[in-house]
Amino acid sequence: MFQRTKTLLAGLAASTMLTAAAFAGELIINTDTSDPAPKKAFEEVIAGFEAENPDIKVTWNLFDHEGYKTSIRNFLTADAPDLANWYAGNRMLPYVNAGLFEAVDDVWEENGLNESLASAKGSMTIDGKIWGVPYTYYQWGVYYRKDLFEANNIAVPKNWDEFKAAGETLKAAGITPITIGTKYLWTAGGVFDYLNLRTNGYEFHMALTRGEIAWTDDRVRATMANWKELLDAGFFLENHAAFSWQEALAPMVQGEAAMYVMGNFAVAPLREAGLTDDQLGFFQFPMINSDVPMAEEAPTDTIHLTANGKNKENGKKFLAYLARADVQTQINETMGQLPINKNSSVGDDKFLQAGYEMLSNTDGGIAQFFDRDAPAEMAKAGMEGFQEFMVKPERLDKILERLEKVRMRINK
């Protein structure tokens, strides 16, 4: 654990009154932003906050990821900081339900965040209250070989029929429509998320991952039926269960596959493998159900006011600072990700620009990712089931029955 503290002013404890004032000027922040880019971003944001608030002494406790996951419930209960980082959506739910996070609707109201952070408001809301401030996310969607589309006269598909037609054209040209590597399961979770969001919408998807809807529900079956259309048409890379997500990049680089449902972190290795920005493009996962608003997948990092922290007002002051457009621009420039504040700016990278435009205009909700939105046991069973379905779609009934047993056990 790394600790950063601002040196106390000389003679601060000289009087009881000054000591009381010093206590009022403290702020303790716990995070697991220990990778180089997030660590640098937090160093910068804390330095900026201190420069604007010289009367507040910031103590920053930095954990490694695994240590943080095992420690967070304990320190929120027994030795709470004022602020702690976590994730949006259902990942907040255990700490909200346990009374360990505090609602910050007032911070949003007083700082115009209902408008400037509107795209992420749904993922920050539980039981009608807002439980933190989001500061970074990155998009998922469809990354594709523009040159292969152009060579086969394929326009970017906007809806399900156009998407399937594009796949058929690619297959006829001897090109695998969609590459994927499901060896480590989570990539199949991303495909399920988008199919379910497009078929049934954000509210249904979140209720399903919370365990409130049966896996044998007809609406889940409708999602799986849409997936089966792609499987029956042979759209996915053969033997995908043997490949990692990185290994599945190779067919796309070699021109043997045209699309990948993936997060923006795939761009760097695709470029490093030799694809140019003239060859590589991005589009929003197409509409399936026109009655369903277009929700997106964008894992979101957040900061939360703790219920047991001692310096509530200073915590709220930091949250307001963190939400500012200029601050989110700076953080995400350092991290190479996207600001949530719609008044922030992004650099010249075309994929960041495309993601920022898409997410800033999203009104259907922001999902986090299957293994963030579902409890760990359900996420593991679900992603195992998705991979199995992609290999053996005829086992659908058994897979859904198995997932329903897991849901019932978790929620009994």
Give the positions of each predicted feature.
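Short, solvent-exposed loop/beta-turn-alpha elements that line the ligand-binding surface or hinge
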Residues: 102-116, 182, 199-222, 272-275, ...
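Glycine-centered hinge/linker elements that transmit conformational signals in sensory
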Residues: 167-169, 210-240
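Extracytoplasmic/periplasmic substrate-recognition and gating elements
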Residues: 47, 51-52, 152, 225, ...
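Extracytoplasmic/periplasmic solute-binding protein
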Residues: 127, 131-135, 140, 164-213, ...
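Hinge/lid segment of periplasmic solute-binding proteins
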Residues: 87-140, 164, 191-193, 219, ...
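Extracytoplasmic "Venus flytrap"/periplasmic binding protein-like
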Residues: 44-116, 123-125, 147-158, 258-259, ...
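Conserved C-terminal helix/tail region of periplasmic/extracytoplasmic solute-binding proteins
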Residues: 51-52, 57, 150, 329, ...
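A structural signal for short loop-to-beta-strand junctions that line the ligand-binding cleft
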Residues: 81-82, 112-148, 176-180, 292-295, ...
